[in-house]
Amino acid sequence: MGNTLVPGKASEAELSRMMETYGAMLTGTCTVLLGDRHLAQDIVQETFIRAYKKMDSFRGERPESEKAWLTRIAVNLCRDERRKKWFRFEDRTIPVEMMTLSAPEASEEAQQLYATVQTLPQKYREVILLRFYQDLTAPEIAEILHQATGTIYHKLTRAQEMLKKRLERCDFGG
């Protein structure tokens, strides 16, 4: 079996491969977006359930397409979760040591950078996460977030400017 979904060939083996390949990455992404690791794990499970049900309609031909497709499902589910009345993102943060995106022995600089990224407004935090933690391109991010590529470039530039200013105030990275 290859690295991409085969339309019309949905199987448990395919689902297992996707979970093994993308599970940790999606959990890290959802954890950053939601600030709650347990809720993120629930969202990732729902992501794979939805992906499994929709495998026959997936038209990706490249492994990157599969990653972007799964990420789009997960990000949309996170957005839905944040829209719920009871969920207040600003009250939820997660320590860097719990992130799967970071090495277990994260350096002090990595911890400071993560903490600073967490202070960004959600729309900038999303693009930073997808670009630098998931290594997605601006066009892939645009597809995931259903926004124009130019908008993504603008948000990335603005987010980097904000990070630079905030890190300079902390005397970091100088």
Each model region followed by its residue ranges:
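Internal acidic/polar
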Residues: R88-A115, T137
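N-terminal module of bacterial RNA polymerase sigma factors
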Residues: M1-M25, V32, D56, A115, ...
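C-terminal flanking helix
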Residues: G23, T27, F48, P121, ...
